[in-house]
Amino acid sequence: MVLCVIAVVFLAFLLIYKELEKFLIFFSIFSYCIIYFIS
């Protein structure tokens, strides 16, 4: 759950700078978060 919160905050940070490459990194983290939540 903590990782999910960090990921959301990270997304907000990236939206400010609009860096697509780092957004893809966030998307990877977010995907991991979803898998962890399902498990």
From Swiss-Prot:
Lineage: superkingdom: Eukaryota
Note: Partially overlaps API2.
Protein name: Putative uncharacterized protein YDR524C-A
